[in-house]
Amino acid sequence: MAMSDPIADMLTRIRNAQLAEKASVSMPSSKVKVAIAAVLKDEGYVEDFAVRQADGKANLEIALKYYAGRPVIERIERISKPGLRIYKGCDDIPRVMNGLGVAIVSTPKGVMTDRKARASKVGGEVLCIVA
């Protein structure tokens, strides 16, 4: 059976791996997942990521980050879901924890953080929040 929400699956895998104190987590790859991983790396929430080919299928491997033995990501949640998409204009994109966290937004200019979307004056689909 096909997966109904691959992005939620990705976020859940990251959350579960960090709770289990794993060094890395692997999942099926897609362009959107790679873009989300790139934003997480740029914002300092993960160490690194790489796309690896295994048996003709691309897998995304994310190296998780810890500080003083605790996961750097305290909270990671899906906002826009397949059954209820959430689109926001550039002025309405939510600030996560008053700017301490980030909202990851899919815009016509690509996947980016809420701050970059506001600076670029572009809105889009609010994929998830990370704090």
UniProtKB/Swiss-Prot annotation:
ATP-binding among keywords: no
NCBIfam families: PRK00136.1
Molecular functions (GO terms): rRNA binding; structural constituent of ribosome
One GO cellular component term noted in the UniProt record for this chain: ribosome
Organism name: Dechloromonas aromatica (strain RCB)
Family stated for the protein in its record: Belongs to the universal ribosomal protein uS8 family.
Name assigned to this protein: Small ribosomal subunit protein uS8
Keyword Membrane listed: no
UniProt gene name: rpsH
Subunit structure comment from the entry: Part of the 30S ribosomal subunit. Contacts proteins S5 and S12.
Known role: One of the primary rRNA binding proteins, it binds directly to 16S rRNA central domain where it helps coordinate assembly of the platform of the 30S subunit.
Superkingdom per UniProt: Bacteria
